[in-house]
Amino acid sequence: MLRAIPGVGDAILLKLVHAFGAPDAVLSAPQSALEEIGCRPPLVEAIRRGPAPDAIRELDKESEQLQRRKVTVLTYLDAQYPAPLRTIPDPPPLLYVQGSLLETDRHAVAIVGTRKVSAAGRIVAEELARDLAKMGFTIVSGLARGVDAAAH
């Protein structure tokens, strides 16, 4: 829900959640508390307003699509969130998981690229992902269109 607020990107989202403990606590935080952690007035106002109705509808549609594709969303706060990712300087606040996370997923590779992939590029991404998966690598992707989607 916080990502639907203008001005809240990944880094700010993590900062807010670290400060307040949970997304709901951020949305109900007093103005003074938001200012204390360094939020500027326009961001404080945006957080206090919450996401716009259009943004909420988009999130609902995205949630339905993820359910249809059997994708689980893990947040940085979830116990299943991979421990190695917690140690990097700018960890993703959300992970989209198809299938299940296993101990063997420590050997993972991300396949990313353009959203406007050519037919040849799509084939290369698909074959690369398939070959790496056969070798025991977990394929990681942001689920964006193009190369990312082809990798899955």
Which residues does each predicted region cover?
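Short, positively charged patches
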Residues: M1-K134
